[in-house]
Curated annotation (Swiss-Prot):
Keyword field contains Ribosomal protein: yes
NCBIfam families the UniProt entry points to: PRK00831.1, rpmJ_bact
Highest taxon listed in the record's lineage: Bacteria
GO biological processes: translation
SS bonds (residue pairs): none
Molecular function (Gene Ontology), one example: structural constituent of ribosome
Alphabetical list of SUPFAM superfamilies matching this protein: Ribosomal protein L36
Signal peptide residues on this chain, from the entry's feature table: none
Name recorded for this polypeptide: Large ribosomal subunit protein bL36
The entry's keywords: Ribonucleoprotein, Ribosomal protein
GO CC, any one term: ribonucleoprotein complex
Family statement drawn from the similarity comment of this UniProt entry: Belongs to the bacterial ribosomal protein bL36 family.
């Protein structure tokens, strides 16, 4: 999982990527290709 300052590029990397907010942090999850997972500080 990458820690990024901006998730704009992360959510457009793959069409299955979704932006989700958990525990006050913002995550990008991708079920079909999990190496695109990312989180924002």
């Amino acid at each position: 999982m990458k820690v990024l300052s901006s998730l704009k590029s992360a959510k457009t990397r793959h069409r299955d990527c979704k932006v989700i907010r958990r525990r006050g942090k913002i995550f990008v999850i991708c079920k079909s290709n999990p190496r695109f997972k990312a989180r924002q500080r």
